A protein has these predicted regions:
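A short glycine/serine-rich beta->alpha loop
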Residues: 17-19, 67-70
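An amphipathic alpha-helix signature
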Residues: 2, 6-10, 30, 76-84, ...
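Short, conserved glycine- and acidic-residue-centered signature motifs
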Residues: 22, 72-76
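His-Asp-centered metal-binding catalytic motifs of divalent-metal-dependent phosphohydrolases/nucleases
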Residues: 44-67, 75, 79, 83, ...
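Short helix-capping and hinge/turn segments at secondary-structure transitions, especially at repeat
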Residues: 58, 84-88, 92, 105-109, ...
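Divalent metal-dependent phosphate-bond-processing catalytic cores, especially two-metal-ion Mg2+/Mn2+ enzymes
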Residues: 15-42, 53, 109-201
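Acidic/histidine metal-binding catalytic segments
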Residues: 41-49, 90-103, 117
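Amphipathic alpha-helical interface surfaces
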Residues: 79, 83, 96, 100, ...
Length: 201
């Protein structure tokens, strides 16, 4: 049953993740949760499901395309609304579904997680916004996301992430994992500043 529902969830997300690079976030995120939670007691089934389903609402075909609607779109609520049926269809243990929804609802940096499962997921998601991966994920949105019309928009977000996110990490394992990512993102932004010569646009 374990392999069945995990495979089912992975296949569902792989078929729905659009643009295609959105898919990589899920397996990377889950791998990070395993490193973060290596010496912690938590429910790996809950974290697995939440890691794979938490961003369903940002996929093309699930999010609204109208810019006005998109500006007020709550992708977390959408994921929480859709997740129960997906989990049921894949044979996920019904008694664990509420914990998955709680973890999804508390996974963003501004949230205050109320369980170890949610804390691990939130910390992992912060790591995905730092380092080389964080830079790639943000830059890939330029010209495709209404928030990112230019490289300047992307760099502003990356600088904000570098300044704000490290201090929001909760767990010691995550803090250690964050160190090289923080350094990598800082080096990248320094290089952009020195190479752009005031003409980044």
């Amino acid at each position: 049953m374990l392999a069945t529902f995990r495979t089912g969830i992975e296949k569902f997300i792989q078929s729905h993740a659009k643009p295609v690079e959105k898919y990589g976030h899920q397996p990377r995120l889950y791998a990070l949760t395993r490193h973060i939670g290596a010496d912690l007691k938590y429910d790996d089934d809950v974290v697995f499901a939440a890691a794979w389903l938490h961003d369903l609402g940002v996929f093309v075909g699930h999010r609204p395309e109208d810019p006005a609607e998109l500006a007020s779109w709550d992708h977390v609520r959408y994921a929480c609304d859709c997740a129960p049926q997906i989990l049921q269809d894949t044979g996920f243990p019904a008694e664990k579904i509420p914990a998955v929804l709680a973890a999804i609802s508390e996974h963003q940096p501004q949230d205050s997680p109320t369980s170890i499962d949610a804390t691990i997921l939130r910390d992992a998601d912060i790591l995905e916004q730092l380092g080389g991966i964080g830079a790639l994920r943000t830059i890939a949105k330029v010209g495709r996301d209404t928030r990112f019309s230019t490289f300047t928009d992307a760099v502003k977000t990356l600088r904000k992430n570098l300044e704000a996110l490290p201090g929001q990490i909760r767990l010691e394992n995550t803090k250690r994992l964050a160190e090289p990512r923080i350094a990598a993102l800082r080096n990248f932004l320094d290089a952009v500043e020195s190479e752009s010569a005031g003409a980044l646009f």
